[in-house]
Amino acid sequence: MMRDREKQPRRKARGKDEASAEEGKKGILGSRAGKAAAGLTAAAVAAYGVYLLGSARTRRRPVTELPNALNLRLDYVPWQDFHYAYYSRKGRGRPLVFLHSINAVASAHEMRPLVRRFQRESERPILALEWLGFGHSDRPEVEYTPELLEDQLEHWLTEVVQPRGGVDVIGLSLGATYAAELARRRPDLIHSLVAVEPVGLGEDPTEIPRIWSRLLFTLPGVQRAFYDRLTTPEALYRFSRDELFTPEFGVPEEYVQYGAETARVEGASRPLDDFLSGRLFPEEAREAFLRMRQPLQVVYGTVAERRMESFTSLSELEGRPNVEVVPLPTGALPHWERPGEVYERVGDFLERAEKGAVAPA
């Protein structure tokens, strides 16, 4: 139900001490880290010009102007000093939870193709969380960490969803990785996990020095301007074309449009520093999946030029009684390129998991 947007006592998120944080974390930009780092300074200089000139296209908007991404009921939950948002539809059976990824323009809209399929063809309760800092949720000036977002997920499942016997989760990228860690710590909350293009099953990440993010955001307005430059419709289209979707499929217009919309919300650039520096990527992401005992399905695209992970660690999961691996000839968003096939494979897996046909590890 709708919660009053009143301030609640703040609970400090779990995290490492500052001394440990200063050592830096491993960033998950894979083998592309060097190429990305090489262009950051030039992009920052160009972006600063955007900030100085200003533009109606980069005008900041309140989150209330962001369109409803899923055509579902949208509610807000007070937590710590903030409020986060989630979508929901009532139904029968075990709740089905969708978790979007973490990136420069992330929101629940990323899960739209699968959500629409389950809306039409299933009677199950459907819920989709929007992480703090993204979508309709508050975008505060805080340090964004895996621990903060895992705590948010735990709070939502415990206090709002309140599942009996756990929920079935469909998570994208880091959304799946956070769910895997929570499934290990709180097996009572998560019955099964479908991980679409999960983070943590590839090669060891290349470290991105923290100095890059500090250099970028020294001048006033550079963080916002750099973000604005990266999230114009034209820039999002080029990135999606070159990095996410296969040429045969192309780039969905709605994917670009909604990404540009959410990027214009006030505070949208605040998680960017933590994302680029690698602080949002769990150090033990691989272990989170290896330690899972619940039914786990991994869905990923096999077109190497259009994915963010190498998935070299999948061999350690394959063959386990609780794991099913589904490779598809797509880019980094298989549920966009082949929504019908992904729906069928996911639906079949969840049905078998419900019947106990997928054995726990």
Question: What is the predicted role of each segment?
Answer:
Residues 122-170:
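Active-site loop/oxyanion-hole signature of alpha/beta-hydrolase fold enzymes
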Residues 28-57:
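Hydrophobic alpha-helical topogenic segments used for membrane insertion/localization
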Residues 320-361:
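Catalytic active-site module of serine/aspartate enzymes centered on a nucleophile-bearing elbow/loop
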Residues 88-136:
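Conserved HGGG/HGGXW glycine-rich cap/lid loop of the alpha/beta-hydrolase fold
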Residues 171, 175, 179:
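Gly/Ala-rich beta-loop-alpha elbow adjacent to hydrolase catalytic centers
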Residues 184, 192-224:
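Flexible "cap/lid" loop of the alpha/beta hydrolase fold
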Residues 204-206, 229-288:
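Conserved alpha/beta-hydrolase catalytic His-Asp/Glu region
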Residues 291-330:
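Conserved loop-alpha-helix segment in the C-terminal half of the alpha/beta-hydrolase fold
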